[in-house]
């Protein structure tokens, strides 16, 4: 079923691989690459807050390097 916000936060805090993020969270609504391609930004639209949450992926390791999840 759906994960709670806390479960999502706990999951992202472990710096999982991008494939694991997509498997767990589903496909992002939008993906952007940083200027030097070192970071990939996955945006997920959240209906409740009418805004996007962001997950940063390090392009060389493919691990989560940061996130903003409200």
Which residues make up each language-model segment?
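Residues within mature, well-folded domains
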Residues: 1-70
